Amino acid sequence: MFRDILDRRTILLSAAGLAGVAVLALMPQLFRDQLGEAFVALEDASTGWLWVSAAAFIAALFCSASAWRAATKLPDRIDAYARYGVGSLVNSFAPAHAGDAVRLALFAKASPGDHKCLTAGKALAGVAVARLACVGVLLLATMKPIALVLLLLAPVLGRVPMWVAAATVARVAAAAAVAAAVGVPAPVLTALLVVPAIDLAGLFAITPGNIGLKSGAIAIALQAQGVDMTTALSTGIAFHAVETLVGITFGSAGTLYLSRVPVPRWAVGGATAVVAAAFVGSMVLV
């Protein structure tokens, strides 16, 4: 199934994205000093706030998975979480939103009824429209904070908008926690700008895992608000790192669940310890 979804076009886009990253890496005159200072600044980031951001990212994934489950009417909640997680895992490494295609295929396979592909396609479109509306509310809230009340009205529109709105709130909380971790003033207002910037960068996901583009979009959005380059880059790097690590962990668990491969308890314990150690290590490093 994955071979059909991750076709030659995706592989070419991935190669092009990696080539772009390699070019930047081999041209030290481009942002070398700023990037170096940004990584140094991450040493002073608050580990506690980064943990909070990780928890918020996890909540956002569960809410997004619930939106897909509501749209496709899957009976098994855990199964829906797992299928959504596999898409998150693919998006962590592949460009062009390949994870969404994987997600579409997995949910279509499990959707009830005769028109499985149509049901999954409607779910993808419905979630996308709801997410776009929520992003619009966030942009409006940067000028009129009272607009955030509109997110509270989402349950009136149905379960899908409700879960998408909840995921949006969780993403804003994650962004605010990252901003607080690196010392950005007014972290909540910053988060209201960062989340739409990330979604805009997602339209040009030509690099694997959108590496570089997402951090750059965050940095540009923060600089427009007067945040210095070093802090802006630190925020972008920290946000992408925590989100990616959470996505990989969530997706790996989903893949393991769907594969139904018998795994010894010692292996599960060992894998859990490795993931925990990697997470703690990353928090210490940044």
Where do the language-model regions lie?
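Short polybasic/polar patches that bind polyanions
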Residues: 108-109, 180, 202, 209, ...
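Membrane-interface alpha-helices at helix entry/exit sites of multi-pass transporters
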Residues: 79-82, 100-101, 111-128, 136, ...
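Hydrophobic alpha-helical membrane segments of integral membrane proteins
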Residues: 105-106, 121-124, 132, 206-208
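Helix-loop junctions at the membrane interface of multi-pass solute transporters
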Residues: 70-72, 104-113, 127-128, 222-224, ...
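Hydrophobic, aromatic-rich membrane-embedded alpha-helical segments
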Residues: 81-109
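Predominantly cytoplasmic-facing regulatory/coupling regions of multi-pass membrane proteins
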Residues: 1-86, 132-203, 229-286
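Interfacial segments of multi-pass membrane proteins
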Residues: 107-115, 194, 198, 215-235
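Transmembrane helix boundary and interhelical junction motifs in multipass membrane proteins
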Residues: 62-68, 94-104, 203-219, 247
